[in-house]
Amino acid sequence: MQQRRPVRRALLSVSDKAGIVEFAQALSARGVELLSTGGTARLLAEKGLPVTEVSDYTGFPEMMDGRVKTLHPKVHGGILGRRGLDDAIMEEHQILPIDMVVVNLYPFAQTVAREGCSLEDAVENIDIGGPTMVRSAAKNHKDVAIVVKSSDYDAIIKEMDANEGSLTLATRFDLAIKAFEHTAAYDSMIANYFGSMVPAYHGESKEAAGRFPRTLNLNFIKKQDMRYGENSHQQAAFYIEENVKEASVATATQVQGKALSYNNIADTDAALECVKEFAEPACVIVKHANPCGVAIGHSILDAYDRAYKTDPTSAFGGIIAFNRELDAETAQAIISRQFVEVIIAPSASEEALKITAAKQNVRVLTCGQWGERVPGLDFKRVNGGLLVQDRDLGMVGAEELRVVTKRQPSEQELRDALFCWKVAKFVKSNAIVYAKNNMTIGIGAGQMSRVYSAKIAGIKAADEGLEVKGSSMASDAFFPFRDGIDAAAAAGVTCVIQPGGSIRDDEVIAAADEHGIAMLFTDMRHFRH
């Protein structure tokens, strides 16, 4: 049973007025009586719409600078009244049934995001009447439609036209879910903001207490269900943040290929975040969340050719990310050379998409061009808890490096050192990266001892016939012993970049001097677990 309910009277009170005039016009044209408040009522009246101010309906004026507008029994009785059950009491108190409530809330998030926002500004942008109406209407969804998203306006009018001015219970229930999600997210933002003021806020003090609130409330929106998770016996879904401000796998548009898997999304994120580190045309190939080949070149085709050479075996079935538009020539090189799961780039030419379309299983994503990296939080779930930290956006430049050995690096060694240092940031610890002429030639990832990561990087370079002599090596953390330097020297490395900070730094530096290796300290670590 559809349990349709006709919409005869609607209350409209919105902060974000995008589309509200057109929606109100459509409702009015279908015989819906309009109630409204404050600025919304004035806007509708200016547009020539017949609208009744809520204060005229209730006989009670807005007061306290707008703090009290809709908190009245004639409003909430009209929303909460159960049709067929509360009709007599509503008639006795001259309460009119309100069949639709259209509300969005004061812009609290935008207010507190503004530089210099005071606590008083934040407090005045905490909506009280709005969430109360939203919750009332959502609770009584059996009889009332609650609309909190302007993106629903058109669909609502279409359904009313298809149902003689009525909405079905299924629609009202879906709108109620959106409403409760909306108020939950709103309250979470307020709780997080106030939580970050504790314990510093006492009376006149307005200094924030720290980066993290005492209670962390998170709101993510489900983008898609997955066939399964990391493994086939695990169920999974992909959730995204609302209003993501940076180009990412969460904001990317899939323009081709079958549905993304859980592992596809995780690996694509790793590849894209790595390629963002480079200003020059760059390519990153990822397998199991680790870069297996990275290069910069005079074009993305050149970068891809060089990245692929690092480890063609691991590149099979990998994820490829670019920081420039995917062109036809590069697309052809990829398709003719290897099996690839996902290609992601800021954009893709029509010719490139025609080429990749020949391989139906290849997923192509475009994410738009990115600007500066946006600070945020990283989360790691542990049994019974959640680890939270700032995103690792740290990176050093040449001017911040310290040469700690007798020999200075050459210009090319320095360029390669900075290049592989960027790559090492995205390799699972313990991470060792060999690079020469702006391409990786060997990557040792995820080993329990740093020396074995160094050995693996050398083995990979030798297996592919890549010359290590004269290369630079990056280590994501300090060398606890000299053995990693000895292994690098045996492979042919002539420059090392690492954080420093070991109690055996002197021993490690001495080993570098013995081998004639130039060593640079970054004083910044990039563990990745």
Swiss-Prot record:
EC number: 2.1.2.3, 3.5.4.10
Top-rank taxon: Bacteria
Residues modified to N6-acetyllysine: 287
GO molecular function, one term: phosphoribosylaminoimidazolecarboxamide formyltransferase activity
Alphabetized SUPFAM superfamilies for the sequence: Cytidine deaminase-like, Methylglyoxal synthase-like
Swiss-Prot/TrEMBL GO biological process terms: 'de novo' IMP biosynthetic process
Reactions catalysed: (6R)-10-formyltetrahydrofolate + 5-amino-1-(5-phospho-beta-D-ribosyl)imidazole-4-carboxamide = 5-formamido-1-(5-phospho-D-ribosyl)imidazole-4-carboxamide + (6S)-5,6,7,8-tetrahydrofolate; IMP + H2O = 5-formamido-1-(5-phospho-D-ribosyl)imidazole-4-carboxamide
Gene3D superfamilies reported in the protein's UniProt record: 3.40.140.20, Methylglyoxal synthase-like domain (3.40.50.1380)
GO cellular component: cytosol
This protein's pathway: Purine metabolism; IMP biosynthesis via de novo pathway; 5-formamido-1-(5-phospho-D-ribosyl)imidazole-4-carboxamide from 5-amino-1-(5-phospho-D-ribosyl)imidazole-4-carboxamide (10-formyl THF route): step 1/1; Purine metabolism; IMP biosynthesis via de novo pathway; IMP from 5-formamido-1-(5-phospho-D-ribosyl)imidazole-4-carboxamide: step 1/1
UniProt free text on domains: The IMP cyclohydrolase activity resides in the N-terminal region.
Keywords: Acetylation, Hydrolase, Multifunctional enzyme, Purine biosynthesis, Transferase
Family membership noted in the UniProt record: Belongs to the PurH family.
Protein name: Bifunctional purine biosynthesis protein PurH
Matching InterPro entries: AICAR_Tfase_dup_dom_sf, Cytidine_deaminase-like, MGS-like_dom, MGS-like_dom_sf, PurH-like
Domain annotation MGS-like: ranges: 1-148
